[in-house]
């Protein structure tokens, strides 16, 4: 699984507008990262979708957390027990 995850991270980074990608488990453990997102971001990235899910009354709703700045966007979404973050730069 580790090799497959690393391959997915590398494939994601091939997109020129993506400068970082990170995958964590539900405990905030960094499972893999590339580019601008690193181990120090794992805890915060894993908790944001959990807080966002508390803002909806629909338990099947899966929110995407978007952190936007003038320089780009970090999109974060939880899938089952994994959380994925992608950092895209503004073109």
UniProtKB/Swiss-Prot annotation:
InterPro entries: LAMTOR5. GO terms for molecular function: guanyl-nucleotide exchange factor activity. Keywords: Cytoplasm, Lysosome. It comes from Xenopus laevis (African clawed frog). The keyword Cytoplasm applies. It comes from the Eukaryota. This is Ragulator complex protein LAMTOR5. Part of the Ragulator complex composed of lamtor1, lamtor2, lamtor3, lamtor4 and lamtor5. The Ragulator complex interacts with slc38a9; the probable amino acid sensor. Component of the lysosomal folliculin complex (LFC). The gene is lamtor5. Pfam families: LAMTOR5.
């Amino acid at each position: 699984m580790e090799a497959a995850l690393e391959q997915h991270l590398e494939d994601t980074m091939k997109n020129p507008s993506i400068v970082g990608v990170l995958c964590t488990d539900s405990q905030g453990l960094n499972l893999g990262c590339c580019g601008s997102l690193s181990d120090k971001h794992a805890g915060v990235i894993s908790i944001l979708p959990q807080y966002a899910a508390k803002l909806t009354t629909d338990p099947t709703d899966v929110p995407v957390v978007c952190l936007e700045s003038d320089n780009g966007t970090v999109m974060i979404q939880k899938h089952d027990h994994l959380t994925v973050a992608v950092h895209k730069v503004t073109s």
